[in-house]
Amino acid sequence: MLYWLTQLLQGQYHAFRVFQYLTFRSILASLTALIVGLLCGPLMIRWLRGLQIGQMVRSDGPQTHLSKAGTPTMGGVLILLAITVSCLLWCDLRQTSLWLVLLVTLANGLVGWVDDYRKLVLKNSKGLPGRWKYFWQSVIALVAVSYLYWNASLPVHTQLTVPFFKTVTWDLGVFFPVLAYFVIVGSSNAVNLTDGLDGLAIMPIVMVAGALGVFAYASSNAVYSNYLGIPYVPNTGELTIFCSSIVGAGLGFLWYNSYPAQVFMGDVGSLALGAALGIVAVVVRQELVLLIMGGLFVIETLSVILQVGYFKYSGGKRLFRMAPLHHHFELKGWSEPKVIVRFWIITVVFVLCGLATLKLR
């Protein structure tokens, strides 16, 4: 909305022309989301406490987690609010890719909200049954990828770009929706599995989102994309601002989610933000780069898959002390802050490797 206003004013006041630049609006979007998160955080925490919406803790988990019982959750609503407000203020709302990404994010947030509401308010320990959660995630993803597939007007829209190789691309054709579906749903659930310690998930989300914003910016510019050897995807520049909003909102949330956490994001936050990373990667054609930069989420997910599979086929034996992997290290004696910071460091390495693909081709 403010972007539209500056468009009207720039003819009379040349200073407003600065709002044409994606970089400037991205900075403003990030700061706006950060301020919304910081200012609304205490209000959200008090509101959640008043509703007695507190985290339930697994009795078979690390004993240090018992003190977390009752900590307000569903704080992901705050993150989504900050992102939405920031995007509405600073984005060019005529760009359809922005609306697609924003709607996929909010729709997955709604699925997570229903799950949290059933568990915490209705006191249904199972929340939204897994099959229904997966069903609605699938519906959202299929609608999104179908829209992208049927509106693909350029070969790049359905091509898979291989990192580190300048000219290696595969035209997925009818298999594009399949890949895109698994990226969106897989990313959503991977982030959800990672969100198990104070601040563990939100900082990697911030880092990956920031890096995806760089790819969105470069991909939307014909000159930059040609120089860097990445796909040129027109009309995706506003996703840079969307990713910047995630960065600001995530940092604002981390202020209250850092150890010891005053609030948790809940499924409403983790499912939404995971889906956001997935759909942005799909739109800017960087699915494999997301696999690299989101390596922590991949590792956490694989630890759960391996644990369940090994337990089933070994007659009850466990590969890890507990899954997801962060709980394994806690039970080995690592303090929670040490696990969190070390996993953040791992994410920094993965994100730098992903960004390196911009030049190493």
From Swiss-Prot:
Keyword Transferase on entry: yes
Catalysed conversion reaction: UDP-N-acetyl-alpha-D-muramoyl-L-alanyl-gamma-D-glutamyl-meso-2,6-diaminopimeloyl-D-alanyl-D-alanine + di-trans,octa-cis-undecaprenyl phosphate = di-trans,octa-cis-undecaprenyl diphospho-N-acetyl-alpha-D-muramoyl-L-alanyl-D-glutamyl-meso-2,6-diaminopimeloyl-D-alanyl-D-alanine + UMP
Segments crossing the lipid bilayer: 27-47, 70-90, 97-117, 134-154, 167-187, 199-219, 236-256, 263-283, 288-308, 338-358
InterPro entries (alphabetical): Glycosyl_transferase_4 (IPR000715), PNAcMuramoyl-5peptid_Trfase (IPR003524), PNAcMuramoyl-5peptid_Trfase_CS (IPR018480)
GO cellular component, one term: plasma membrane
EC category: transferase
Membrane topology field: Multi-pass membrane protein
Pathway noted in the entry: Cell wall biogenesis; peptidoglycan biosynthesis
A Pfam family annotated for this UniProt entry: MraY_sig1
Biological process according to GO: cell division; cell wall organization; peptidoglycan biosynthetic process; regulation of cell shape
Role description: Catalyzes the initial step of the lipid cycle reactions in the biosynthesis of the cell wall peptidoglycan: transfers peptidoglycan precursor phospho-MurNAc-pentapeptide from UDP-MurNAc-pentapeptide onto the lipid carrier undecaprenyl phosphate, yielding undecaprenyl-pyrophosphoryl-MurNAc-pentapeptide, known as lipid I.
Protein name stated in the entry: Phospho-N-acetylmuramoyl-pentapeptide-transferase
Organism: Legionella pneumophila subsp. pneumophila (strain Philadelphia 1 / ATCC 33152 / DSM 7513)
